[in-house]
Design a protein with these regions (language model features):
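Beta1-alpha1 glycine-rich phosphate/pyrophosphate-binding loop at the start
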Residues: 1-75, 80, 161-166
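FAD-binding core/adjacent interface of flavoenzyme oxidoreductases
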Residues: 71-165
Length: 166
């Protein structure tokens, strides 16, 4: 039995998993495992629509377990990758705390992080758009600015409150 472990349940990790499921669908000698911090896939290109309130968050998430057929799935956070011992330790959630997963082949598809290139002012005065929570925070801030502008009598201050840079 060969064990393929995929770390990351975003676009790359899930697509890799689905392709491997399809390729090895009739091969009982292959065991696929997917680990992700979330139990859902988030369609991040639609986060601006969530922030603007034009769609609801439920429209851009799909449970991972509904998409995979042959793959074991674990929701958890990676604590340690041991390339020599061919194992990954998870912090995990619920009953899977401290779990150790062995593999023969490892796919690392852990996504990306926003890089502000050391520009602290940009980092402190901008909004990231990576998660549903990020979109909700931005939406709430825009609503707050619009409420403030609605009640502002000074036209210069009102204009400043409504100035948003994208």
């Amino acid at each position: 039995m060969k064990r393929i472990l995929i770390l990351g349940g975003g676009f790359a990790g899930l697509e890799c998993c689905l392709k491997l499921e399809s390729y090895f669908q009739n091969n009982p000698e292959i065991e696929l495992t997917l680990v992700s911090e979330d139990n859902f896939i988030l369609f991040t290109p639609m986060l601006p629509q969530v922030a603007s309130g034009t769609i609801e968050t439920r429209h851009i998430v799909t449970p991972i377990r509904t998409l995979i057929k042959k793959t074991k799935f674990y929701e958890g956070k990676i604590k340690y990758i041991d390339p020599h011992g061919k194992s990954v330790t998870l912090y995990g959630t619920n009953e899977n705390r401290g779990m150790l997963i062995h593999y023969d082949f490892l796919v690392v598809a852990l996504g990306s992080q926003t890089n502000f290139f050391g520009m602290k002012d940009v980092e402190e005065n901008s909004y990231k758009m990576n998660t549903i929570n990020d979109a909700i925070i931005l939406r709430n801030r825009i609503i707050d600015l619009m409420e403030q502008a609605e009640n502002e009598t000074d036209p210069i201050l009102r204009k400043a409150l409504l100035k948003i840079v994208v």
